[in-house]
């Protein structure tokens, strides 16, 4: 990103869009991994106390921001060479988001919480065992210290700069985005 933004000059305009946790119809990465874990009975617990907020970006809002950036990113413009966080602007607890999706799909929700310290220690043991066995720690749904830290850290960003410079205003709120996503998952048979 630094190199791309630094390349912006009088003849070439560049811009960076920084979405966080993209979701929506045709998602093949974020929600499918969570849904599979829940359907397989492998999402019985939340990690931590649930107070950590995360931002989510519905795909249509991301597209809207990309189009706005493309329209405004010309050499010499204030947008050129800038980076913009783009989310729905509605931070919520990660597991609150997940539970809303699971509930609408009639999948089991986590029933208890594991304290951060215990989850982190268990992840350390799991990583050690996976290393001994030669398993791939890079797989998407692994139980790792990184995953535990991620779940127990705030991940939300101000979209004020995108609002100001790009005229960005999310058109689809979280509730509607979840509803549309779940409808698509039901239509296409997510499993």
Show the residue positions of the predicted features.
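Short aromatic/basic micro-patch
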Residues: 16, 56, 91, 156, ...
